[in-house]
Structures are given as structure tokens and as C-alpha cells.
């Protein structure tokens, strides 16, 4: 039994290959150091950064988390001018870990968590990268934006006391 997402993603990388025949490796030995480094940045400043921003209880904490979040997104935008993915030109675990936050960003984090400096669609390279990941075989079939929005907007009554789930925004998917 495990509910730690960083460990679960590693298990799914190879633990069931003998059953599925899938040989995809999103954590290749030669790239592990780079993947681990980018995972640290992405987790602390983006994946968890949206929560630090959204659940901040002081103006200072909000502004600090907000600034770090968008500085890191700006860095990712620059990185993606040089490569198609976070670690070179192959999709790795680092990309899938970032995907989960990016796919929710414009619909949830931008308004609900007040991460409202820029939308992901305002970052041309990140937006193209997100579309590319979304179109990987089997991925779009797992994204249910109505479920995502309902979860966030209806469950965080401290942030959204009415529980109203917004109709928008219009997204590419």
C-alpha cells in the first residue's frame, strides 16, 4: 500500500512491465540525476507552489510563493526553447510530474488559487509542450476537466465558500 505519488510513478514505470509488455522507461538510468534535479525544482516551486500560493494565510507568504512559482514557470519556458521536454528530447518522469499541474492550471489554479500573473496558454513553449503531452497515446482519455474543477471548487470551502464550479474557461481539450 502506498499513496506517495513520487513513489507510485516509479512503480508504474516498470513494476508491471512483465504483465503489460510495456517497455517504456520514463526514468532511464543515464538521465536519473537530471530527472531528480528537475523534479525537485518542479515539485517545490510549481506542483507544491500552486498550493503554497492558494493556501497562503498571509500576504507575505502569498507573494513569496507567487513570485517563486512564476519565476520557475519563466525558467521552464526558456528551457523549452532549447528542447522538446524537460530533460532533453525524450519524455521522462519529470514531464509527467509537471503535466499534472499544467493541465489544471488555467482552469483551477489561475483563479481558485490566485496564481493569476499568467495562464499557461500565455507561455507559448509551455503551452505547446502541454498540448504535446496531452496528445500522447492514452493521456487525453484520463483527463476529465469537469471532475478536476468540481473537486477543487467544491471541496475547498475556505477558498470558495459557495462551492460554485465555474463554467469556463474554454480550453484546447
PLM ranges: what are they?
Residues 1-173:
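C-terminal alpha-helical interaction module
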Amino acid at each position: 500500500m502506498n499513496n506517495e505519488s513520487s513513489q507510485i510513478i516509479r512503480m508504474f514505470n516498470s513494476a508491471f512491465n512483465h504483465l503489460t509488455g510495456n517497455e517504456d522507461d520514463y526514468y532511464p538510468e543515464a538521465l536519473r540525476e537530471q530527472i531528480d534535479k528537475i523534479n525537485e525544482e518542479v515539485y517545490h516551486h510549481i506542483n507544491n507552489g500552486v498550493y503554497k500560493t492558494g493556501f497562503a494565510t498571509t500576504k507575505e507568504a502569498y507573494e513569496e510563493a507567487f513570485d517563486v512559482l512564476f519565476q520557475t514557470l519563466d525558467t521552464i519556458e526558456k528551457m523549452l526553447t532549447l528542447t522538446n521536454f524537460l530533460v532533453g528530447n525524450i519524455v521522462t518522469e519529470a514531464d509527467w510530474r509537471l503535466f499534472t499541474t499544467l493541465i489544471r492550471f488555467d482552469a483551477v489554479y489561475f483563479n481558485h488559487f490566485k496564481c493569476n500573473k499568467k495562464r499557461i496558454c500565455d507561455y507559448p513553449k509551455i503551452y505547446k509542450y502541454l498540448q504535446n503531452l496531452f496528445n500522447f497515446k492514452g493521456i487525453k482519455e484520463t483527463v476529465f476537466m469537469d471532475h478536476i474543477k468540481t473537486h477543487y471548487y467544491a471541496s475547498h470551502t475556505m477558498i470558495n465558500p459557495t462551492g460554485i464550479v465555474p463554467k469556463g474557461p474554454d480550453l484546447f481539450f
